[in-house]
């Protein structure tokens, strides 16, 4: 998409859009946008403003978390998986995670938010719709932020005024084809920022299922990540503080409890995305095959998180904390017949439309914003601000929860491990978790770079399979 202008087909949403019941966490809601009479009607509509696909599968294929595994019997799931891994133009349109599906579905979410906002803005009693307006603005901002993460360059304040952005529809279109100017990345981020700030002021918390909606906590986690990517590090810290409060430890996942569960079937994945887990701030229910392809099924083995990547760079790699799978609260799942080395985090459930024909829809649930990831957002922002003691405190708070014996690091531990004497920079011949940064902004070699290497290394492990690694690759020019 290198053209300055483009056409978007704003596709009308299906009248009954929504995911059907699938275990206790899938929930179908009617689309009542054609009969909006009350704030409750708008709330029901806004269920469809949360995109029903997720880029994790695509972004994991793009990122350095995935390797090509050559062995008889290990095949690609389909041509889409091969095209994504090989970084060629993706011509496939049928899987749920293709760029074309992602594009149209996220713009559908924007359209839904705009329908809600149009109705709200036409009402005499605006105050009755304050919470719905806040949620609609946050959903629009989130959809556009996610589109930017896939289809745009990483934000860089030195180039954002010339880097291409994306169209940002702010009204309901009545024509099928509307011509939009892409604008710049600076324009796009400014519009996301505006919606985010207004939405944060209005967002409510009165939902039947709050973990599936933006609340003050999940919206603040979104803001923390957004401002980190926007290179506004003070604001990233500010909003992370709103999530974590004065006792971040109390917000974090009970990794030991999760690790104690069986890695077989869907036990660990369902526990990981449970709405009862305090650390899970926003859950996203989507149509996706990633729970199978990135999971324990013998499916899509050719392009997967391999033994080499696992042992040298990620979940079995050595870090300043020790050997990761010996130190951390998880069990690496693998069997002799699989190329994959995985953590059981993404559930897979197949909803049959016709059991006899084997036709239906695969589903997954993602923990899109969590307290643990927000803590590492704050740690990274503190490091980029030069607040190394605060960054180390956050790192150690996460390590205390994530590790079996509460391992703690000193600044010297971090600097020593990510030094040339101990861990050389990655090369294809000698892979390591330490990868060279290529950023427009300066990073000091003595303390800042080792701290950032450590935070990115831990985030890569902790969020494996969730699609976030690709954003670090983009932001740091890895």
Residue ranges of predicted features:
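Conserved, well-structured interaction surfaces
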Residues: 80-152, 183-186, 196-205, 359-366, ...
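Sec-dependent bacterial lipoprotein signal peptides
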Residues: 1-22
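Aromatic-residue-lined binding/catalytic grooves and analogous aromatic/hydrophobic interfacial grooves
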Residues: 23, 217-256
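Hydrophobic-face positions in mid-chain alpha helices that act as interaction patches
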Residues: 237-372, 405-442, 458, 462-468, ...
């Amino acid at each position: 998409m290198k053209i300055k202008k483009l056409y978007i087909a704003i596709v009308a949403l299906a009248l009954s859009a929504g995911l059907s019941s699938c275990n206790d966490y899938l929930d179908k809601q009617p689309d009542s946008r054609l009969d909006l009479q009350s704030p409750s009607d708008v709330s029901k509509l806004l269920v469809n403003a949360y995109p029903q696909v997720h880029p994790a599968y695509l972004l994991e294929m793009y990122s350095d978390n995935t390797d090509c595994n050559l062995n008889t019997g290990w095949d690609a799931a389909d041509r889409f998986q091969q095209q994504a891994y090989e970084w060629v133009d993706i011509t496939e349109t049928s899987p749920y995670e293709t760029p074309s599906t992602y594009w149209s579905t996220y713009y559908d979410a924007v359209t839904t938010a705009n329908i809600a906002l149009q109705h709200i803005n036409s009402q005499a009693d605006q105050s009755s719709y304050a919470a719905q307006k806040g949620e609609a603005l946050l959903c629009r901002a989130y959809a556009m932020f996610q589109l930017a993460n896939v289809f745009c360059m990483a934000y860089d304040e030195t180039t954002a005024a010339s880097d291409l952005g994306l169209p940002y529809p702010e009204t309901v279109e009545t024509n099928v084809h509307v011509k939009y100017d892409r604008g710049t990345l600076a324009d796009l981020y400014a519009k996301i920022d505006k919606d985010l700030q207004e939405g944060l002021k209005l967002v409510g918390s009165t939902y039947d299922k709050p973990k599936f909606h933006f609340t003050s906590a999940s919206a603040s986690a979104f803001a923390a990540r957004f401002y980190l990517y926007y290179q506004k590090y003070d604001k990233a810290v500010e909003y992370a503080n709103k999530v974590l409060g004065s006792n971040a430890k109390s917000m974090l996942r009970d990794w030991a409890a999760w690790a104690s569960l069986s890695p077989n079937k869907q036990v660990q994945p369902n526990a990981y995305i449970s709405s009862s887990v305090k650390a899970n701030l926003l859950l996203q229910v989507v149509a996706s095959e990633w729970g199978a392809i990135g999971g324990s099924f013998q499916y899509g083995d050719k392009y997967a998180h391999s033994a080499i990547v696992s042992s040298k760079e990620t979940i079995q790699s050595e870090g300043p904390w020790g050997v990761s799978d010996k130190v951390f609260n998880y069990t690496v799942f693998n069997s002799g017949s699989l190329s994959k080395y995985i953590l059981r985090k993404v559930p897979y459930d197949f909803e049959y439309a016709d059991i006899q024909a084997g036709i239906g829809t695969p589903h997954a649930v993602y923990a899109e914003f969590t307290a643990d990831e927000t803590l590492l957002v704050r740690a990274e922002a503190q490091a980029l601000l030069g607040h190394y003691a605060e960054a180390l405190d956050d790192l150690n708070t996460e390590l205390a929860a994530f590790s079996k014996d509460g391992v703690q690091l000193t600044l010297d531990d971090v600097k020593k491990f990510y030094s040339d004497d101990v861990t050389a920079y990655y090369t294809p011949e000698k892979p390591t978790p330490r990868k060279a940064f290529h950023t427009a902004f300066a990073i000091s070699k003595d303390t800042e770079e080792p701290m950032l290497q450590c935070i990115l290394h831990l985030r890569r492990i902790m969020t494996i399979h969730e699609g976030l690694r690709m954003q670090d690759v983009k932001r740091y020019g890895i």
